[in-house]
Design a protein with these regions (language model features):
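Hydrophobic multi-pass inner-membrane translocation pores used for secretion
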Residues: 271, 277-283, 306, 322, ...
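Generic structural signal for small/hydrophobic residues in well-ordered secondary structure
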Residues: 62, 111, 153, 164, ...
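Conserved core of the PLP fold type I
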Residues: 135-268, 280-296, 467-468
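Short beta-strand "wing" residues that participate in macromolecule-binding interfaces
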Residues: 76-78, 383, 412
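N-terminal basic, amphipathic alpha-helical segments
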Residues: 1-130, 331-337, 349, 359-367, ...
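Conserved glycine-rich beta-strand-loop-beta hairpin in the small C-terminal domain of fold type I
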Residues: 362-373, 381-395
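Conserved core segment of the aminotransferase class I/II
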Residues: 298-362, 466-467
Length: 470
């Protein structure tokens, strides 16, 4: 297909099946052509009036279809110049993050981003007014972690970590730990589905991901045991509110995974890296394999979802030697996380009003999860009960669901970027049973009201295919 050509209405009708002339079906047919390569990036689509006349529908019908495609990120409007098939996402984003990047087009309800509800975050104003007299900004020699924050972190840590440091967010912690643990060509056990930036990071580091399947309690011990036979150097997992499934480990599951690692052969140097990204908004208790494997576990606690993504702050705890290696390497870069930010976080962690705000946020997210999840299940969608702000929703067809929801003014995240290599390949090749079927991620934490109406749209998209299977 030659990109950048003008596709007239006659050509589009030859390529597509517009026997169902509803906005949703028309959008689905054009989506199929884009994803199949029949329409290329930069191709100019027929005008609304031209295609409406050719098909025999009203211009409003085509306009609604075009709007749905734009919301799904497949086409873009350039004003009087017309509507065009979108090009590739910016190269500044890694491959799977490009797959998750949402277009800038406004939608009625954006459930794609996996971010906390801003209205549930503690106010920073009072903390800022209090810390101005306490924060230290004039020293290169002070301790990298302010002592008061170190004590608060240690008192609440889920295991007896030998050392704890503060870094610039959970992904910074994961990246710095992996850089100390893995070498090019090493194997790393990952969850599938899992967090797309982890998979991008492993690709950048030249490692080989070994996917492990999940259930409602996280990694399955028998699947982990099979993965360990490939002699990985690290296991990367999310103990609570797993992104995207919302699964949280029970203490029994954590112990079973730890015993599985203990029993495995030829993995004596294996390191477990835990990303507790939801932290204080998770309804489940803090849990770590470090309770049973203290010398082999690095535990990360993020404060982004509980206290604000722009604070860019997380804590990292584990064996002293490894933490000191990470801290030493960091001194050759940023050195430390701003002590001003650390002081703000400390204030938020001990202030009664901020504590109550986070407690209420945790309750609200639990209520939103339960309300929307129950509504979906009552409508025939087999959504597994989840923790945190995300829900992994099974659908008959990923692209079809995205287009249908876009037509309803709702944006969700496509499921494919969350799959590790072999599972993603299976999904792309249509081997849905082996890959576990099609899914989309829904940020239910953003559903403040009208859960039944949202559930109606989600369930319809999950249980129906538009024309052509898209």
């Amino acid at each position: 297909v030659v990109s950048g050509i003008r596709v007239d209405a006659e050509r589009l009708i030859d390529l597509a099946d517009f026997s169902d002339a509803s906005p949703r079906a028309i959008a689905g047919e054009v989506a199929r052509l884009v994803n199949g390569g029949d329409l290329g990036a930069g191709d100019r689509l027929p005008t609304v009036r031209e295609l409406a006349a050719a098909i025999g529908v009203s211009p409003a019908t085509i306009s609604q279809a075009w709007q749905a495609l734009a919301r799904a990120g497949l086409i873009e409007s350039r004003g009087r110049a017309g509507s065009f098939v979108r090009g590739a996402a910016s190269a500044r984003l890694a491959p799977r993050m490009r797959g998750m990047a949402a277009p800038d087009d406004p939608v009625r309800l954006d459930l794609s981003r996996g971010t906390p509800d801003p209205l549930l975050l503690p106010a920073l104003g009072p903390a800022l007014s209090r810390v101005s007299a306490k924060a230290e900004t004039g020293s290169y020699q002070a301790e990298p972690v302010i002592p008061q924050l170190a004590r608060v972190l240690r008192d609440s840590w889920p295991s007896d970590a030998e050392a704890i440091m503060v870094v610039d967010g959970a992904l910074d912690a994961i990246s710095r730990t992996l850089e100390q643990v893995v070498r090019f060509g090493d194997r790393v056990v990952v969850e599938s589905p899992g967090f797309p930036p982890f998979l991008d990071l492993l690709e950048v580091l030249g490692t080989v991901p070994v996917p492990v399947r999940l259930d409602e309690h996280g990694m399955r011990p028998e699947s982990l045991a099979a993965a360990l036979r490939k002699r990985p150097v690290a296991v990367l997992l999310q103990p609570r509110a797993q992104n995207p499934t919302g699964a949280s480990m029970t203490p029994a599951r954590a112990e079973a995974l730890a015993r599985t690692i203990e029993a495995a052969e030829r993995v004596d140097d294996l390191v477990v890296i835990e990303d507790d990204h939801s932290g204080l908004i998770s309804i489940e208790g803090d849990v770590t394999l470090g309770t049973w494997l203290p010398d082999r576990v690095v535990h990360v606690r993020s404060f982004s979802k509980s206290h604000g993504p722009d604070l860019r702050i997380a804590a990292l705890g584990g064996p002293r030697d490894l933490i000191e290696h990470i801290a030493g390497r960091r001194m050759l870069g940023p050195g430390w996380t701003s002590r001003m930010l650390q002081t703000i976080l400390l204030d938020l962690l001990v202030d009664g009003t901020a504590i109550n705000t986070v407690t209420e946020a945790r309750r609200q997210y639990y209520t939103r999860q339960r309300t929307l999840g129950d509504a979906l299940r009552s409508r025939g969608v087999a959504a597994v009960p989840a923790d945190g702000i995300n829900l992994w929703m099974p659908v008959l067809g990923e692209r079809s669901a995205l287009v249908q929801l876009a037509a309803a003014g709702i944006r969700v995240a496509a499921g494919t970027p969350f799959l590790a290599a072999s599972d993603a390949t299976d999904a792309a090749n249509g081997m849905r049973q082996r890959a576990g079927g099609d899914f989309v991620r829904v940020t239910v934490g953003a559903v403040r009201a009208a859960a039944d109406e949202v559930a109606d749209d989600l369930a319809s998209a999950a249980t129906h295919l538009v024309a052509g299977g898209y």
